[in-house]
């Protein structure tokens, strides 16, 4: 149910105390006034700590700097019928016992008068003594239609011809997802006066979004310049992803397609799991948010779950986007769920519920190295659209990986290197280890003040001990599990 319909229902069913979490007080007040005029036909009294009651000329300056008087004022009005009392920042005062007692005393009379108190709050501060009286709502940030409408309004006010940006207006609107209306106004006013091109305009908005997201402390915004051309091999996985590249478009929605949930990538270290996350972001042209699971967990009881919920909210507000959860196996293991105080289990439960039920266009990419220690709930169907295994690259894939890295380091002369021979030498090497061997060869040649050659790479390979040789048991166990048919192969 939408926020508007939810609030309308609460106000029409004698809910005495409604607590609205929001970061846009001005917009919330406007929406409530609009709802009253169009649908509810109630009287509204607005209060803030500095001005007291300010919107009714008969009661100006009542209860200035006195939150208890703000509640007592309701009684002085003799409980008028069908009235809303909109109290700003009242969460700061609601834990006062005098305020709590007065609200409880008034609740029965407010219900009889079909009147309500709406508290506008920037954070959750609900006293336990009022939990049975309060209904909590969350005021969402502006949706696509609201942002689009506001941008057209701002363009008109600033005498900017919106047709100049018409081709990119959809992308412009999407870029501002996760912004408040006030932040959009400040941002677009600054950017439009700079006379930027459409492409640079969107890049600047994404930079501002990056700063906004990183204020959460648990999410990191990745600006990537990758595509599937940077990924060697993994053709099955890339084909699967290509078929979903337009999954968040209007055409897909009109076709009746559901929003994809995401993928779990399991594999040996260095096989390209993190690279794929970055490549999807670039290929699909969607922002990439990386979750720092270590910062989710806190020492205070309940704080970890709250941080996870806040992360989910931020990701959904920034949608469509890609959420990258790297090395999820380090945080959620079967052992942790049994040995810790229950925090891991509760955080995992919060995340799994969201993965199963989410409707917003957030594509989740989770990566793991140790599949055998992952809790079975994470592998259950419905959490992710698909689970892929990334094995050590084949001969053909190693050739492609060598080509990609040599083209990156020597874009004009990469063909002079004997890629086929190098690929045969690097059996059991991961993609990351191949790159490291090339870098090692470059360092050695640079030290000798000359260009590096195929022989330098061969020497580096001969001195390199890949993980497959040092961790044979674990890698063999993972490969045996994958080959058994319990997971889809990425190649």
Curated annotation (Swiss-Prot):
The keyword Chloroplast applies. GO terms for cellular component: chloroplast. Keywords: ATP-binding, Chloroplast, Nucleotide-binding, Plastid. ATP binds at residues 267-274. Its main location: plastid. One of its GO terms (molecular function) is ATP hydrolysis activity. The keyword Plastid applies. Transmembrane segments: none annotated. Belongs to the AAA ATPase family. Highly divergent. This is Uncharacterized AAA domain-containing protein ycf46. It comes from Gracilaria tenuistipitata var. liui. The lineage of its organism: Eukaryota, Rhodophyta, Florideophyceae, Rhodymeniophycidae, Gracilariales.
């Amino acid at each position: 149910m939408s926020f508007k319909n939810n609030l309308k229902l609460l106000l029409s069913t004698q809910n005495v105390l409604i607590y609205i979490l929001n970061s846009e007080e001005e917009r919330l007040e406007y929406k409530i006034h609009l709802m009253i005029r169009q649908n509810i036909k109630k009287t509204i009294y607005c209060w803030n700590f500095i001005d007291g009651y300010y919107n009714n000329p008969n009661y100006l300056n009542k209860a200035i700097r006195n939150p208890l008087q703000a509640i007592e004022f309701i009684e002085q009005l003799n409980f008028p019928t069908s009235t809303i009392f909109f109290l700003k920042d009242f969460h700061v005062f609601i834990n006062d016992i005098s305020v709590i007692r007065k609200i409880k005393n008034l609740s029965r009379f407010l219900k009889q008068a079909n009147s309500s108190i709406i508290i506008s709050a920037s954070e959750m501060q609900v006293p336990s003594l009022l939990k049975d009286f309060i209904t909590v709502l969350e005021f969402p940030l502006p949706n696509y239609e609201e942002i689009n409408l506001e941008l057209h309004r701002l363009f008109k006010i600033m005498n900017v011809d919106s047709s100049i940006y018409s081709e990119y207006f959809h992308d412009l609107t999407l870029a501002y997802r996760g912004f408040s209306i006030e932040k959009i106004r400040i941002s677009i006013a600054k950017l439009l006066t700079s006379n930027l091109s459409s492409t640079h305009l969107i890049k600047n908005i994404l930079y501002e979004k990056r700063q906004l997201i990183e204020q959460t402390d648990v999410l990191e915004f990745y600006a990537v310049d990758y595509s599937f051309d940077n990924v060697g091999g993994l053709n099955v996985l890339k084909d699967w992803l290509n078929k979903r590249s337009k999954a968040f478009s209007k055409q897909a929605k009109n076709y009746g397609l559901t929003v994809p949930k995401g993928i779990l990538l399991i594999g040996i270290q260095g096989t390209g799991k993190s690279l794929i996350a970055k490549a999807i972001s670039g290929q699909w042209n969607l922002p990439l948010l990386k979750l720092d699971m270590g910062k989710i967990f806190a020492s205070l009881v309940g704080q970890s779950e709250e941080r996870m919920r806040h992360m989910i909210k931020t990701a959904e507000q920034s949608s469509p986007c890609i959420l990258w959860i790297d090395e999820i196996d380090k945080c959620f293991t079967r052992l942790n769920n049994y040995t810790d105080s229950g925090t891991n289990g509760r955080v995992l439960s919060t995340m799994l519920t969201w993965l199963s039920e989410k409707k917003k266009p957030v594509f989740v990419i989770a990566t793991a190295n140790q599949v055998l220690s992952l809790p079975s709930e994470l592998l259950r169907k419905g959490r992710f659209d698909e689970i892929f295994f990334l094995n050590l690259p084949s001969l053909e894939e190693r050739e492609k990986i060598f080509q990609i890295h040599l083209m990156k380091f020597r874009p004009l002369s990469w063909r002079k290197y004997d890629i086929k021979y190098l690929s045969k030498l690097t059996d059991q090497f991961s993609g990351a280890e191949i790159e490291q061997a090339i870098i090692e060869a470059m360092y050695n040649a640079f030290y000798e003040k000359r260009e590096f050659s195929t022989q330098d790479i061969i020497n580096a390979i001969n001195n390199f001990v890949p993980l497959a040789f040092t961790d044979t048991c674990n890698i063999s166990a993972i490969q045996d599990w994958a080959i058994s048919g319990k997971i889809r192969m990425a190649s």
